[in-house]
């Protein structure tokens, strides 16, 4: 065998004596070797990890930069991403309508606003419309400071907002007056106009203003946990109340629980601000402990009197509204697909009462009280969103709206307003905003604004919905997007994306990059709704978790087999992609069925399934994967854990490209580090490369600048093209009609 271009791989020390003993229900004590455990030490704390990272970065960069199509892809992506896009508008308490906006290649979306009375003016303006209110692009020189969330005060005078840097889950909360917007001429790296309030030590933005607008509640950790660059799990989450104008050190502790350091405590307020719902989460399951209080009669400074409404790990509660002593919830209490319920806090002994019963065939994903007495419910039904309007007083259905649209929706509205904005998008629909009047008898809204993508004729594309049988015969739904004239004869390259976990549904989502991939490579983009998601309700999720996790891999592999059998693909032209939990999927499938795939892309993947609970948020994922330290769970986890089941012998692995970040504080990069080291050791002279692209300036996924995403996508697509021998149609006019897979 000739020596491949990537031989030899960068050296890394391998400790053959490193091992951990686990307890197995089937086999008793089991000693598991872990020769790359040294790579668990974070980048900043280990010279060995640092040397490994720098060597892998250089190695991968050299290979990727030598791909001829890489620069062409980068330029093509830049040109295609340069279009105006915006989010669903939201009317706020200051009399303005706010929306996020990007003129094309800005690093982050900016926040703009227009007076409610002047909303329609943005439809006739050639630019973004309205005025700039806040621009995260002005907060940093490299574009990696991102807005993680915001909340307007009830009085409309103050705006609390969270800022994260370099994709970290850690963020800082600031406050500014709504009368003090950003100026377009502002110097980058500065944030003038904000108030002196600075709230640190928070992971994620969970902020609720008190009804008097004098301060807000928030969740935080002790100062020593504000690292953001290590693997240590955050501990001792607490709830505080901050008063405007005071230092954080003077904030009032609302709740702490030192006996349970890994529980996550958060506080929600009812829309009126009168009732507070305090919840504890111990894992990623949809179960919580819940307490409630009437803070309108409580003294925050001297302690809130809490009433326990649920003391078992059985359900989750989301407060959606209140009327006098009646509180409205969305909950999965005795309803795995969720329902809407009420609680009279003056007669709490009567318990929770059902207002809108559970739909056994659809998952309730959001509930809002709008237009005084309308209950707007969004369901996930058969891998698509549905919007239903009910009467708040009786719970009875009024009508389904936008039933002619297939895809996903996002909504905004207020209880004191008859208007609701609805944003619809899909695989070939970049985004259309409708204004819907809830006090009118109609099931359709009026067009408000639509995203346009110049240079890409969206009518040239089509999306099919098909079902195929999994290994156990279960029917699995799948979306297939392609150009209408792409032949279904097995010659087109196929790119399959999967996730399969945490009840996260894979819905029709617009991506100009994906459509470009389909156009330039005459390819098909495929999304199977495998078990572990929630496309068909909570039962679908449960069929792909814990001891049933293998169903997820079987569903995904079965998708590829069906595509080949039905002439959508052939065995030489299938690439797959997955990130985070989807990284378990891609690496497990590459281990179990390497012959099915030509190229594998894994982004920020969870891969060492015996060690995941020890780092970052991993302990919370045991509800999804199981606990490796539980003998019964160990047996089914160890059986598929990608890091521990790398094939050997004469197996030919697909080409593999791993994306990770040295400071990812959601999924530690150690998963990718260890797995890539093991793959390169096991297959030093394989015909296909195993590369790892490591970023030193980003986190998990959120907050990446546009430039970062463009560069990553150019690396990804050009790597797939080289690995599968694809021809860019933009460079070869005949390739669009005569594309064929070149086996190299």
UniProtKB/Swiss-Prot annotation:
Q: In which pathway does it act?
A: Mycotoxin biosynthesis
Q: Does the keyword Protease apply?
A: yes
The record, for Pfam families, names: Peptidase_S9 (PF00326), Peptidase_S9_N (PF02897)
Provide this UniProt record's keywords sorted from A to Z: Hydrolase, Protease, Serine protease, Virulence
Q: What class of enzyme is it?
A: hydrolase
**Per the record, what are the reactions this protein catalyses?**
Hydrolysis of Pro-|-Xaa >> Ala-|-Xaa in oligopeptides
In its UniProt record, a GO molecular function of this protein is: oligopeptidase activity
What PROSITE patterns does this protein's entry cite? PRO_ENDOPEP_SER
Applied value in biotechnology: Lentinulin A displays strong and selective activity against the plant-pathogenic nematode Meloidogyne incognita but shows no further phytotoxic, antibacterial, or antifungal activities.
Report the sequence similarity comment from the record.
Belongs to the peptidase S9A family.
Partners and quaternary state?
Answer: Monomer.
This chain's function reads: Prolyl oligopeptidase; part of the gene cluster that mediates the biosynthesis of lentinulin A, a highly methylated cyclic dodecapeptide with nematodicidal activity. Excises and catalyzes the macrocyclization of the methylated core peptide of ledMA to yield lentinulin A. LedP works in a two-step fashion with an initial cleavage at the N-terminus, followed by a second cleavage at the C-terminus of the core peptide.
This protein is called Prolyl oligopeptidase ledP
Which source organism? Answer: Lentinula edodes (Shiitake mushroom)
| Recorded name of the encoding gene | ledP
């Amino acid at each position: 065998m000739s020596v491949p271009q990537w031989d030899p791989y960068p050296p890394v020390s391998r400790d053959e004596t490193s091992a951990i003993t686990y307890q197995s229900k089937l086999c008793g004590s089991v000693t598991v070797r872990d020769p790359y455990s040294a790579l668990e030490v974070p980048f900043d704390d280990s010279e060995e990890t640092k040397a490994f990272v720098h060597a892998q970065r250089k190695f991968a960069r050299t290979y990727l930069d030598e791909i001829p199509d890489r620069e062409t892809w980068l330029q093509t992506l830049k040109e295609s991403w340069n279009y105006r896009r915006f989010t669903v508008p939201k009317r706020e308490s200051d009399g303005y309508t706010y929306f996020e906006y990007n003129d094309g290649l800005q690093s982050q979306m900016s926040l703009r606003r227009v007076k409610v009375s002047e909303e329609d003016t943005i439809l006739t303006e050639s630019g973004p419309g309205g005025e700039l209110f806040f621009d995260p692009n002005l907060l940093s020189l490299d574009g990696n400071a991102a807005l993680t969330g915001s909340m307007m005060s009830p009085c409309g005078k103050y705006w609390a907002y969270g800022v994260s840097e370099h994709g970290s889950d850690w963020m800082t909360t600031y406050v500014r007056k709504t009368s003090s917007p950003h100026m377009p001429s502002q110097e980058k790296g500065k944030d003038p106009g904000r108030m002196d309030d600075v709230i640190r030590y928070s992971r994620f933005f969970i902020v609720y203003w008190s009804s008097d607008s004098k301060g807000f509640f928030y969740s935080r950790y002790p100062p020593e946990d504000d690292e953001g660059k290590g693997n240590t799990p955050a501990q001792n989450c607490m709830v505080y109340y901050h008063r405007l104008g005071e230092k954080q050190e003077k904030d009032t502790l609302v709740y702490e629980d030192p006996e349970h350091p890994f529980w996550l405590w958060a506080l929600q307020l009812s829309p009126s601000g009168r009732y507070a719902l305090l919840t504890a989460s111990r894992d990623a399951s949809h179960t919580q402990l819940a307490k409630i209080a009437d803070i309108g009669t409580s003294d925050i400074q001297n302690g809130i009197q809490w009433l326990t409404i649920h003391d078992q790990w059985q359900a989750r509660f989301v407060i959606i509204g209140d009327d006098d002593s009646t509180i409205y919830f969305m909950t999965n209490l005795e309803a795995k697909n969720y329902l809407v319920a009420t609680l009279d806090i003056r007669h709490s002994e009567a318990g929770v009462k059902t207002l809108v019963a559970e739909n056994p065939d659809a998952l309730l994903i959001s509930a809002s009280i709008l237009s005084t007495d309308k209950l707007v419910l969004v369901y996930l039904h058969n891998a698509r969103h549905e919007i239903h309007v009910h009467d708040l007083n009786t719970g009875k259905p009024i009508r389904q709206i936008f039933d002619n649209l297939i895809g996903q929706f996002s909504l905004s509205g207020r209880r004191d307003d008859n208007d609701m904005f609805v944003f619809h998008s899909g695989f070939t629909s970049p985004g259309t905003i409708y204004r819907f009047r809830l006090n009118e008898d109609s099931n359709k809204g009026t067009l408000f604004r639509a995203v346009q993508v110049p240079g890409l004729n969206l009518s040239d594309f089509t999306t099919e919905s098909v079902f195929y049988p999994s290994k156990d015969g279960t029917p699995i739904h799948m979306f297939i997007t392609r150009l209408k004239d792409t032949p279904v004869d097995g010659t087109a390259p196929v790119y399959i994306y999967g996730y399969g976990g945490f009840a996260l549904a894979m819905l029709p989502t617009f991506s100009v990059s994906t459509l470009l991939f389909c156009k330039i490579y005459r390819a098909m983009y495929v999304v199977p709704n495998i078990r572990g998601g929630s496309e068909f309700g909570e039962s679908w999720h449960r069929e792909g978790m814990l001891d049933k996790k293998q169903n997820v891999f079987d569903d995904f592999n079965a998708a590829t087999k069906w595509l080949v059998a039905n002439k959508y693909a052939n065995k030489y032209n299938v690439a797959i992609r997955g990130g985070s939990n989807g990284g378990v999927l891609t690496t497990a499938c590459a281990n179990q069925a390497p012959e099915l795939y030509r190229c594998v892309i894994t982004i920020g993947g969870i891969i060492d399934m015996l060690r995941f609970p020890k780092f970052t948020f991993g302990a919370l994922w045991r509800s999804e994967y199981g606990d490796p330290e539980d003998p019964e769970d160990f047996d089914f986890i160890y059986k598929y854990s990608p890091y521990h089941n790398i094939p050997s012998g004469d197996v030919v692995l697909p080409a593999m490209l791993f994306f990770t970040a040295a400071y990812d504080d959601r999924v530690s990069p150690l998963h990718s580090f260890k797995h890539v080291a093991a793959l390169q050791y096991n297959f030093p002279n394989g015909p296909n490369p195993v590369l790892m692209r490591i970023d030193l300036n980003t986190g998990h996924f959120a907050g990446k600048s546009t430039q970062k995403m463009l560069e990553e996508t150019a690396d990804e697509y050009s790597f797939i093209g080289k690995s599968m021998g694809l021809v860019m149609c933009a460079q070869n006019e005949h390739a669009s009609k005569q594309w064929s897979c070149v086996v190299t």
